[in-house]
């Protein structure tokens, strides 16, 4: 039976890759709703190609722009806007599958709505689990939703794990691989001079600017550890991080009998997306087959926590529990935005997050509203810290 998709965040890199896979298999997948924040022109192009029933954007002005262009082209797609519209298309009877690819905390409410509606959820939004892991996973279980991870690392672990729960499958630990980003071998003393363009030049993956910066600081890997804790039900001390510069092995599962299972593939997000879309079947993703002889060598090393303090901060937040992970995520989003706008330097990202975690008292959240309140409080603190920070050095010519 054909799957009907709501694609949250269709104009981002995950959205592009998802629609590429969808276009290859029109007999398997159709699109009910596409959503974007303010990239109206790209959304119009997608709507004209995939003919969704509904399109959602962030504000009224963008909605008017998109609607006018679609009407002029003869499209019948209904254009909505605002946070509630995101929730509505995520729980609508018009779709059975929700691809959650909105970056940041804005993706939490629609992802949670999809879980409470019992949808098949392809999760690429880390924040739903980082901010409110217990609440989200309870909703998945209580409402019969199906959760399929799309992040390459978590999808790799999913493929290497038994279908039973981890505690019944003889699993010793899971190992998330990380490329190390663009600064793995750079002299630590020079990181203070890093520019946004340098931080966004990932050596292997094509990603958006925010997640590229998170990869450069390795905050992305820290968030993935927290995400893995909730998806697979393992404590933090059974989740390792391993630097693997080639990005060929996407993650590994270590078993009690000494076996280690790994999932390999070329670094292309269409592979995990196609796996999750078609699961339990396999379909062509448009990705070249891996040529191990050409790669010839795979290398590994332990992460340098002094070089990547954001990774250490994320692991600490997971250990502390409570609202710490939500505060970590909120402070990081504010700090990364400030860095991309050249209001703070690269190393100030970790310093800002650390200051917020040390200032905001930790507590056990009392429901989703409390999580969102902690998120807002952490954002205010981060903004205040950044406002007092010294201006970054003048960007050098490269």
From Swiss-Prot:
Residues holding NADPH: 11-14, 38-39, 125, 127, 208
Catalytic activity: 2-C-methyl-D-erythritol 4-phosphate + NADP(+) = 1-deoxy-D-xylulose 5-phosphate + NADPH + H(+)
Cofactor(s) this protein requires: Mg(2+); Mn(2+)
Binding residues for Mn(2+): 151, 153, 224
E.C. number(s) listed in UniProt: 1.1.1.267
Protein keywords: Isoprene biosynthesis, Manganese, Metal-binding, NADP, Oxidoreductase
Pathway per the UniProt entry: Isoprenoid biosynthesis; isopentenyl diphosphate biosynthesis via DXP pathway; isopentenyl diphosphate from 1-deoxy-D-xylulose 5-phosphate: step 1/6
Job description of the protein: Catalyzes the NADPH-dependent rearrangement and reduction of 1-deoxy-D-xylulose-5-phosphate (DXP) to 2-C-methyl-D-erythritol 4-phosphate (MEP).
Protein known as: 1-deoxy-D-xylulose 5-phosphate reductoisomerase
């Amino acid at each position: 039976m054909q799957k009907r998709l709501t694609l949250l965040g269709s104009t981002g890199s995950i959205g592009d890759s998802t629609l590429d896979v969808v276009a290859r298999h029109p007999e398997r997948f159709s699109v009910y709703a596409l959503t974007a924040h303010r990239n109206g022109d790209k959304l119009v192009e997608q709507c004209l190609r995939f003919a969704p029933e509904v399109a959602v954007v962030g504000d009224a002005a963008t909605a008017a722009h998109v609607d006018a262009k679609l009407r002029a082209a003869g499209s019948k797609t209904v254009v909505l806007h605002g946070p509630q519209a995101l929730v509505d298309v995520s729980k609508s009877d018009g779709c059975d599958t929700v691809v959650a690819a909105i970056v940041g905390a804005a993706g939490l409410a629609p992802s949670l709505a999809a879980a409470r509606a019992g949808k098949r959820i392809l999760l690429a939004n880390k924040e739903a689990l980082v901010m409110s892991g217990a609440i989200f996973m309870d909703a998945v279980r209580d409402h019969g939703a199906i959760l399929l991870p799309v992040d390459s690392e978590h999808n790799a672990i999913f493929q290497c794990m038994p279908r039973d729960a981890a505690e019944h499958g003889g699993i010793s630990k899971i190992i998330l691989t990380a490329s190390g980003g663009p600064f793995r071998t750079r002299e630590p003393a020079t990181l203070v001079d890093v520019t946004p363009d340098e931080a966004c030049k990932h050596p292997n993956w094509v990603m958006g600017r925010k997640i590229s910066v998170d990869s450069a600081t390795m905050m992305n890997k820290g968030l993935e550890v927290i995400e893995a804790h909730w998806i697979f039900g393992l404590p933090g001390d059974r989740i390792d991080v391993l630097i693997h510069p080639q990005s060929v092995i996407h993650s590994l599962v270590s078993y009690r009998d000494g076996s280690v299972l790994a999932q390999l593939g070329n670094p292309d997000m269409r592979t995990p997306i196609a796996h999750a879309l078609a699961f339990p079947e396999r379909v062509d993703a448009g990705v070249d087959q891996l040529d191990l002889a050409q790669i010839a060598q795979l290398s590994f090393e332990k992460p340098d926590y002094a070089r990547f303090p954001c990774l250490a901060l994320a692991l600490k937040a997971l250990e502390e529990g409570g609202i710490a992970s939500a505060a970590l995520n909120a402070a990081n989003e504010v700090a990364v935005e400030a860095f991309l706008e050249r209001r703070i330097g690269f190393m100030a990202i970790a310093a800002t997050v650390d200051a917020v975690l040390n200032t905001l008292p930790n507590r056990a959240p009392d429901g989703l509203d409390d999580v969102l309140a902690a998120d807002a409080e952490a954002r205010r603190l981060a903004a205040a810290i950044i406002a007092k920070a010294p201006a970054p050095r003048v960007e050098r010519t490269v």
